[in-house]
């Protein structure tokens, strides 16, 4: 970097320089303290701290740096040269930065410890969390993978913060979450991954009861098999993502047990992403304002075995997810996994009328049939866009009755497998969908030549578009 460029940066006000430093990792920001006394002073007031042991310990690890995109390339190169002089352990580095900043206001604190090459004593982590909470942090991000931390719970002060607006906790082989007392009056976003609660569902409900303005909740990698019941009851919630772990068994990825009860009392929810083994009961399902839903629910291995044993029975039912499916009736945009189609076939006594559904996506699987699709399309009077992610499915005696549907746009993701069978399915659609105005193919390069001939089968008002899929790029 030449002297002119250095002078251009040095004349910037402190507040702007602190803002620039907030785009760097804390390791890079700390390196600027070697430039001059002024930069050391600035580091004490950087509002965002990001500690990542994998980046700190591996000097050659590449991390996307937003300052490159903002035109500070020379500045970043200078910082990278200076940071080579840093030599200390990861825990000591965190201690030094927190000590330097003292009690200055803090917006975000991110701590990621997953490397394992420089083990961190859990007794060091708790004081770090306490320090940033006292400083009024609004965004706390904890990613911890520590085999040593298995007994004591996370500090309870996390759940008694008057300032937290966003809280992210991702823990593997870590402590339980102790939620005897919860008071998070400003928390709007809560992200929990692979965490365990004391008292399971009771502890989880206690946590939610202490978040009066919560708008977004993400529960990822939750082990539903250890919970006998599960309830989400938050009047202010707008977005919910709940994804359970699927356990491998007999070649399938499924939980072994059905939860007894699963309830949703979320009257203002507009977005739902839900992946879980079906429950025995759904006592309450309140999705009155739901706009978009991505549903992946599945049967247990025992239920799948029972289906196989009773496959010749008419209307074979091995579970009951009817109340949950009925609760989705107001949705406008709906995505269904192959496993969900199986649930509609064997665990749903009725398919409701989807009065508002305008966009439906079906993901296909060669081992799963389309039996419930005819009824689903018939019960969606306002459906305009239908998307098939693949056309291969288990053979049935009947084709899907689609001629009476109101679909105007059909989108199909094609693969190179069993292409002839897929083309025949497309021909059937073109012959039996008189209202179709647009057909869009997302295709693999090797199937292109066979798609051009389909234009002759479409009605004059139907436009056909061919778009290369990402796999072919």
From Swiss-Prot:
LRR repeats, residue ranges: 168-194, 196-221, 229-254, 333-364, 365-390
Keyword GTP-binding included in the entry's annotation: no
Record keywords, A-Z: Leucine-rich repeat, Repeat
SUPFAM superfamilies: F-box domain, L domain-like
Domain of life: Eukaryota
Domain F-box as annotated: residue spans: 6-54
UniProt-listed CDD domains: F-box_AtFBL13-like (cd22160)
PANTHER family in UniProt: RNI-LIKE SUPERFAMILY PROTEIN (PTHR31293:SF16)
Listed name of the protein: Putative F-box/LRR-repeat protein At3g59170
Organism annotation: Arabidopsis thaliana (Mouse-ear cress)
High-level lineage: Eukaryota, Viridiplantae, Streptophyta, Embryophyta, Tracheophyta
